[in-house]
């Protein structure tokens, strides 16, 4: 809670370059508070009144002590990217379309699980394409998806997110339009088999028992069985069955090697893991994109298709070029150059102009993207 008549630091409204809602030192009026509520600004940095107290009536301001500068604190720095995204008109439009898609997916899953032998693929695809088109740039897409985590049921939001990410990958691969659309639906339907898993197992807050984990691992087969007889592209069916297979044969349910795994399933596997790792889990906070890139770099090239994974990681890392980040020692800096051989460890520049190559200074790493 805040009260009027205090000073504050920058408050941004998310636009392509960021629009300032209020400059540092602006008096915090009731009108401004209401404006920030409208833009869903979750927190602000408040100046200590001793730094910028208003002059009293009749006071000779010329003789007044020079106002001390407002110290730039971590609170000032961390007007978070989440707040900037959620403050935007674009986000509110995206949010409405996202919820429309979620309802469409929920309805589709319900009908398929009830035994219906067809679904309105065209309407579902149109809704997802409309949502995808409203995102703009790649970074805006990832920003928007991150901010939708708590809006809908985790299963349906995950399926939608994976559909959107697979769609981006398909376009990066310069696939034919019809193939991109099929890949999108494959991403959306990939986890439909989880509808057959009891909620108390699927959403269990504690560690799963061996029996429960074995049941979870059956969801690809459950999903394939649900859509086997639908009049849809066979690649969608294989994606539901194979998205947990891995190129080295370590996946499930059939321990297939790379020669037997459908390309759409391999693309969906990458999107699936990325979305899962950047989501909060009961045992950890959501990982930042560079932590996910690091994880893929350390073990991903034996498990995932190298062509698809390299493309995804390069595009993802490039998305954050010039972005402001925080290191594990709480210092803030900007990414100035990517290391092509280790994308998770770019070269960064601090506010004093000094440069740090994270690939050669391995005690430091990117902890969060601002």
Q: Which stretches of residues belong to each language-model region?
A:
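Alpha-helical scaffolding flanking metal-ion-dependent phosphate/phosphodiester catalytic sites
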Residues: 162, 182-197, 214-310, 318-320, ...
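Acidic/His-rich, divalent-metal-binding segments that scaffold phosphate/diphosphate chemistry
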Residues: 69-214, 227-230
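Single conserved hydrophobic/aromatic residue that forms the stacking wall/gate
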Residues: 1-8, 12
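Short beta-strand-centered aromatic/proline hotspots
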Residues: 331-340
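Basic/aromatic-rich interaction segments and small domains that mediate binding to polyanionic partners
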Residues: 343-355
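Glycine- and charge-enriched low-complexity intrinsically disordered segments
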Residues: 354-370
């Amino acid at each position: 809670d805040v009260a009027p008549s205090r000073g504050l630091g920058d408050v941004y409204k998310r636009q392509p370059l960021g629009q300032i809602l209020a400059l540092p030192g602006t008096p915090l009026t009731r009108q401004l508070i209401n404006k920030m509520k409208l833009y869903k600004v979750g927190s602000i940095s408040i100046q200590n009144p001793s730094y910028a107290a208003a002059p009293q009536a009749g006071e000779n301001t010329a003789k007044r002590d020079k106002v001390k500068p407002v110290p730039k604190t971590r609170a000032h720095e961390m007007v978070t990217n989440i707040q900037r995204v959620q403050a935007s008109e674009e986000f509110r439009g995206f949010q409405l379309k996202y919820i429309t898609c979620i309802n469409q997916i929920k309805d589709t899953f319900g009908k398929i699980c009830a035994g219906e032998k067809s679904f309105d693929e065209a309407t579902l695809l149109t809704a997802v394409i409309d949502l995808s088109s409203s995102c703009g740039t790649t970074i805006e897409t990832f920003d928007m998806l991150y901010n939708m985590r708590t809006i809908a049921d985790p299963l349906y939001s995950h399926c939608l997110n994976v559909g959107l990410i697979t769609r981006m990958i398909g376009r990066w691969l310069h696939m034919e339009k019809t193939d991109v659309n099929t890949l999108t639906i494959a991403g959306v339907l990939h986890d439909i088999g989880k509808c057959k898993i009891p909620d108390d197992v699927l959403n269990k807050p504690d560690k799963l028992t061996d029996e429960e984990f074995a049941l979870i691992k059956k969801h690809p087969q459950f999903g394939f069985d649900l859509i086997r007889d639908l009049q849809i592209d066979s690649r969608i069916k294989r994606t539901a069955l194979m998205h947990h297979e891995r190129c080295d044969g370590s996946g499930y349910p059939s321990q297939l090697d790379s020669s037997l795994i459908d390309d759409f399933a391999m693309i969906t596997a990458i999107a699936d893991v990325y979305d899962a790792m950047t989501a909060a889990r009961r045992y950890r906070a959501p990982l930042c994109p560079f932590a996910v890139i690091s994880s893929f770099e350390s073990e991903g090239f034996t498990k995932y298709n190298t062509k698809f994974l390299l493309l995804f990681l390069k595009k993802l890392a490039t998305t954050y070029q010039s972005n402001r980040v925080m290191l594990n020692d709480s210092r803030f800096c900007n990414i100035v150059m990517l290391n092509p051989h280790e994308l998770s460890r770019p070269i960064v520049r601090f506010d004093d102009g000094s440069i740090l190559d994270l690939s050669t200074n391995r005690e430091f790493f990117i902890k969060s993207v601002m």
